[in-house]
């Protein structure tokens, strides 16, 4: 059995508070947009009708903790795929989510309470 990895400062649930391509405020009434990173290099995110499950790899960007990921999921009834990254900037995450052959958006997220 391998050693347990140390907890990443990015691990856990984060509330997406802004996106460059979509208005987060319009989706908060349905569900608080989030991105969540798990210890097992997995995770998920949801904003509006988009839900994705991630395969994550910890890394660094400019000397700061970061995660790069590929993802697959759905946008309403359509299957979608993509990639993305995020890095820890102070007490927030900043990153990008890309849809293969489609849209992209920057995002900012704050750690969820509790």
Regions found by a protein language model. Name each.
Residues 24-64:
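N-terminal glycine/threonine-rich, aromatic-flanked beta-hairpin/loop signature
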Residues 1-3, 48-54, 93:
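Generic detector of contiguous secondary-structure segments
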Residues 2-9, 13-19, 25, 34, ...:
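Beta-sheet ligand-binding and adhesion/scaffold domains
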